[in-house]
Amino acid sequence: KAVGDDGMIHGVLFANFHDDKADVSQWRENIEAQMTDHERERFRLLADYMLEVDGKTVQCMSDGEVKLSLFISNQKGCGKLLLQEMMDEFLHRDLRHLYLWTDTSCTHEYYPQHGFTLVGQFLSEVYDSYAPGYTTYIYKKGI
């Protein structure tokens, strides 16, 4: 995480190895029970989309590689600093590549401008019915 001079968190990064598994079914069941029908429908669509693109990203990966699973920044420059700190940590751990996925709702143009290579691009089978033409991009970068 990145904390500013004001003591507020301005960015967060999470990453995992390609073979990491997390069972979120109980959490998902609990959270869905608190939702309206409309919220539940939207939540399931987004969760299914994330499972789809995470799976496609992991298929591109091998041992010794890591996936950026969450990258949020609300202050200009904070994300770049967080990403560099993370890359330094991964280099220290002798990891080879960092993978991530992004889509047309994000600033996906950032990644090729900062040394990432596009390794996949596709229209989501899950999300296309909700947002036709919604494109997902998979990038990788050497560590």
Residue ranges and their predicted role:
Residues 1-13:
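Conserved beta-hairpin
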Residues 3-5, 140-143:
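Active-site beta-strand termini and strand-to-loop segments that position acidic
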Residues 14, 19-70, 74, 126-132:
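Conserved acyl-donor/pantetheine-binding loop and adjacent beta-alpha core of acyl/acetyltransferases
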Residues 62-67, 90-103:
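Conserved GNAT acetyl-CoA-binding A-motif
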Residues 75-90, 113:
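Conserved acetyl-CoA-binding loop-helix of GNAT-fold acetyltransferases
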Residues 79, 83, 104-109, 123-130:
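Short glycine/proline-centered loop/turn elements that form peptide/ligand docking sites
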Residues 99-101, 117-135:
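Conserved catalytic-core motifs of GNAT/GCN5-like acyltransferases
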Residues 110-112, 116:
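Conserved active-site tyrosine of GNAT-family acetyltransferases
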